[in-house]
């Protein structure tokens, strides 16, 4: 069970598959964030997989989920590609988001992507500009928490990633969960961890940075 408002690396690894299923089912754009009501903006999941890194023990094993999404507007010739990972930071004892973004000027009507014509976005100013443009957002819209550039803590390549520093995450998540009383004693550990990750997603993960990209279930008839 979750204690003192935090989960362990072991709990993250154990229940990340359930949260990933929730992510794949419910990741969508919120129409109200678009000038046109969202009809001209689309979100497509291009890729999603889990990677487990070698470790001597089950408790110290490191796992991350990598997802690629494409944000596009039907009236624009380009789209915004976002790769993001969900992983666990041992020092801060919280989940952490890393993401990188690309401008794609060659997305065909069939949805195929020419990787040779994808341009990395390497500044927050360029990221914000492309995000506004693709989704048709007004220039006075704001992104969520401040992001910085860094290398990925688990992926050892030359890529530069955006990320939200996790120094305040534990304190803030504890406050949110206590205020909403969202973790019930009768909940299973799996349900508690999935709830915890959902709150984290909305505040310090992709949904916190890009408020229009939400984990919102499809309305039931």
Curated annotation (Swiss-Prot):
Q: What does this protein do?
A: E2-like enzyme required for the cytoplasm to vacuole transport (Cvt), autophagy and nucleophagy. Acts as an E2-like enzyme that catalyzes the conjugation of ATG12 to ATG5. ATG12 conjugation to ATG5 is required for proper localization of ATG8 to the preautophagosomal structure (PAS). Likely serves as an ATG5-recognition molecule.
Assembly, in brief, is: Forms homooligomers.
Q: Name one GO molecular function term.
A: ubiquitin-like protein transferase activity
Q: What compartments host this protein?
A: Preautophagosomal structure membrane
Q: What is the lineage of its organism?
A: Eukaryota, Fungi, Dikarya, Ascomycota, Saccharomycotina
One of its Pfam families is Autophagy_act_C
Listed InterPro entries: Atg3/Atg10
Which Enzyme Commission number(s) are on file for it?
Answer: 2.3.2.-
Annotated protein name in UniProt: Ubiquitin-like-conjugating enzyme ATG10
GO BP terms:
autophagy; protein transport
Q: Which UniProt keywords apply?
A: Autophagy, Membrane, Protein transport, Transferase, Transport, Ubl conjugation pathway
Gene this protein is translated from: ATG10
Major subcellular location class: membrane
Is Zinc there in the keyword field?
no
UniProt GO cellular component terms:
phagophore assembly site membrane
């Amino acid at each position: 069970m979750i204690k003192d408002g935090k989960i362990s690396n072991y709990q993250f690894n154990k229940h990340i598959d359930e949260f990933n299923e929730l992510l794949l089912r419910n990741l969508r754009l919120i129409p109200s964030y678009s000038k046109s009501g969202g009809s001209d903006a689309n979100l497509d999941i291009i890729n999603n997989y889990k990677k487990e890194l070698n470790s001597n023990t089950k408790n110290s094993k490191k796992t991350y989920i990598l997802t690629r999404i494409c944000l596009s507007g039907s009236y624009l010739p380009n789209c915004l590609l976002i790769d993001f990972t969900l992983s666990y930071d041992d020092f801060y004892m919280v989940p952490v988001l890393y993401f990188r973004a690309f401008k794609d000027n060659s997305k065909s009507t069939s949805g195929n992507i020419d990787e040779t014509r994808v341009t990395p976005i390497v500044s927050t100013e360029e990221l914000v500009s492309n995000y506004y443009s693709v989704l048709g957002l007004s220039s006075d819209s704001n992104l969520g928490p401040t992001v910085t550039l860094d290398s990925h803590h688990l992926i050892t390549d030359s890529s530069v990633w955006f990320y939200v520093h996790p120094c305040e995450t534990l304190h803030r998540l504890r406050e949110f969960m206590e205020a909403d009383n969202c973790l019930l004693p009768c909940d299973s550990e799996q349900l508690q961890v999935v709830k915890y990750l959902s709150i984290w997603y909305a505040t310090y993960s992709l949904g916190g940075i890009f408020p229009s990209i939400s984990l919102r279930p499809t309305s039931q008839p």
